[in-house]
Amino acid sequence: MTITEKILARESGARLISPGDNIWVNAGMLLTHDVCGPGTIGIFHREFGKDAKVFDTEKIVILPDHYIYTADEKAHRNVDTLRAFAKEQKLPYFYDPGTASYCGVCHVALPELGHVRPGETIFGTDSHTCTHGALGAFSTGI
């Protein structure tokens, strides 16, 4: 098996997988930012209920990095939505712009902060999420 197949097999509990197989995998880490995060949060609440809780607070990283330094108040609403969700869910990995915890572009910051580990699965709401495959993870945008 390829490294991708090995990672996906392990994360799905299968001994062996092949191209074309349909599998369910355990997510090692989920990423979102200020572009897709608010919509994702809306879907989360719509599908699971207003009082729903995330499955594992340690596996969710929210890092706004697209519209953070702009005069557009609508763009600021996106970060406000992320901030409120992180507080509501008690997410430890919300990197808030303008605070000491902020760390820049998500795809650079994730490995620097230890959120990317070889052999894990990473799903992010950004097409560049796949760059973390260079560090030995299975990583893709959704």
Q: At which residue positions do the language-model features occur?
A:
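Fe-S-dependent hydro-lyases/dehydratases of central metabolism
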Residues: 1-142
